């Protein structure tokens, strides 16, 4: 491919080094060996790290002496040379160097995604951060009735912006205003997304204390509390629901602290502010979610790979506040579920299987990983239906099959509530219906 497209950017996504025989981060020389003449940029599955070759570093203007930006790192070898992996805000120079998608490419991507979602039994999705040009491209498809998927959008400034870029871009969204229930309740843009840290796999999740397996490193926070408050204040003033990507316990504490301040300044008993992932929470902060009414959203399918590294990264004490689904539910929190696709497969039944069993698709570990935090089958089902709808202010429209709600449903190949639990991951859609129209059916 690199020979045929010599000199053109080659971009991709999906590598997870934790599953390799050697889980060390790869090097730029690995890519140079197969594509020396084209810039190559491959994003890790989590989206919070990327692997690039020498040509990509040159094109982006990065050398071994380039200082790390706030909230990101250009990883180096012991001799001081560039390794070939960058994290979080350090991805920004590459994002700016890579040509933007055309409208036609954006539309092709969403139509391919739509078919993948329908075939997996999904009728609605909540999009975790898209810029205005993507939403405008989708609107054109809705007007032509080619896009039938229901999308609840959180607006986001694309790339890895600095604070000034973040505020300028965000104010444009807020000025545009809310768009609710467009195209027969198929498109809503009423949320705003901001990332507070990175991922556990990339060791860029922002922690209160050092990583157990990397002393001296706490990950990367992206904003000061004042910066975060100022942009979220503008979002709330404009009526937007806010989503904060927060993986580490420091990021979740910042999220809760700033939300608490916001709710004092702009009181709202039904704000439904969200922490996206709420993955690692200091034990003393867990009860604050219910107290403040902050919704902790989760991606239970993350367990299938994170269980391989989480104990080593976090240690015996911090793991008690990680992936704490049972604890959060028992305290009265709804727990909306998802997959963060394309971070993981969009298959909801694999995610529900992980929620119920605390195991990977290979039925490991025996007995489940920290099984005391598992969900019941009914809770896992609610996490993809009622609770997810509630998290999007759409519980009056969807989330259950009853008179007056949207005719969106899926016919599956076995009884989810009664099949052996190891079969939950194998459930598949026979027919997917959106608005009373069959949009997918097995042949």
What are these model-predicted stretches?
Residues 442-443:
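Extracellular/periplasmic ectodomains of large secreted or surface enzymes and adhesion receptors
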Residues 108, 232-243, 247-273, 277-278, ...:
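His/Asp/Glu-enriched, well-ordered alpha-helical/loop segment
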Residues 186-204, 293-304:
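Non-cysteine beta-strand/loop elements that form the S-adenosyl-L-methionine
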Residues 141-145, 177-187, 266-268, 289-291:
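Acidic (Asp/Glu)-rich catalytic clusters
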Residues 27-28, 175-176, 339, 419:
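Short beta-alpha junctions and helix-cap segments that line functional grooves
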Residues 1-171, 190, 194-251, 264, ...:
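Divalent metal-binding segments
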């Amino acid at each position: 491919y690199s020979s045929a497209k010599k000199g053109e950017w080659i971009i991709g996504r999906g590598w997870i080094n934790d599953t390799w025989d050697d889980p060390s981060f790869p090097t730029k020389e690995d890519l140079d060996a197969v594509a020396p003449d084209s810039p190559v940029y491959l994003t890790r599955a989590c989206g919070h790290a990327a692997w690039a070759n020498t040509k990509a570093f040159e094109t982006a203007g990065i050398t071994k002496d380039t200082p790390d930006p706030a909230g990101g790192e250009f990883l180096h070898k012991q001799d001081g040379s560039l390794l070939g992996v960058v994290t979080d805000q350090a991805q920004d120079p590459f994002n700016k160097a890579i040509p933007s998608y055309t409208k036609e490419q954006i539309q092709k991507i969403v139509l391919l995604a739509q078919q993948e979602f329908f075939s997996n039994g999904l009728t609605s999705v909540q999009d975790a951060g898209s810029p205005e040009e993507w939403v405008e491209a989708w609107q054109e498809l809705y007007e032509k009735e080619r896009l039938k998927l229901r999308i609840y959008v959180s607006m986001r400034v694309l790339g890895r912006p600095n604070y000034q870029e973040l505020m300028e871009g965000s104010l444009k969204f807020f000025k545009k205003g809310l768009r609710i229930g467009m195209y027969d309740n198929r498109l809503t843009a009423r949320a705003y997304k901001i990332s507070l840290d990175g991922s556990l796999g990339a060791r860029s999740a922002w922690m209160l204390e050092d990583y157990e397996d990397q002393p001296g490193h706490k990950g990367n926070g992206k904003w000061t509390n004042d910066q975060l408050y100022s942009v979220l204040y503008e979002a709330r003033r404009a009526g937007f629901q806010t989503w904060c990507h927060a993986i580490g316990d420091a990021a979740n504490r910042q999220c809760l602290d700033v939300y608490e301040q916001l709710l004092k300044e702009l009181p709202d008993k039904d704000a439904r502010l969200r922490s996206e992932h709420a993955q690692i929470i200091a034990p003393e902060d867990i009860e604050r979610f219910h107290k403040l009414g902050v919704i902790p959203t989760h991606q239970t399918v993350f367990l299938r790979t994170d269980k391989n590294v989480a104990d080593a990264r976090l240690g015996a004490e911090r793991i008690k506040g990680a992936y704490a689904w049972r604890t959060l539910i028992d305290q009265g929190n709804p727990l909306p579920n998802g997959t963060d696709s394309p971070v993981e497969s969009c298959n909801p039944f694999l995610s529900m299987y992980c929620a119920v069993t605390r195991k990977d698709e290979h039925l490991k570990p025996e007995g489940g990983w920290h099984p005391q935090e598992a969900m019941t089958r009914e809770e896992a089902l609610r996490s993809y239906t009622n609770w997810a709808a509630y998290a999007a202010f759409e519980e009056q429209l969807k989330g259950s099959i009853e008179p007056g709600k949207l005719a969106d449903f899926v016919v599956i190949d076995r009884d989810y509530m009664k099949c052996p639990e190891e079969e939950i991951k194998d459930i598949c859609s026979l027919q997917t219906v959106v608005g009373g129209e069959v949009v997918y059916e097995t042949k």
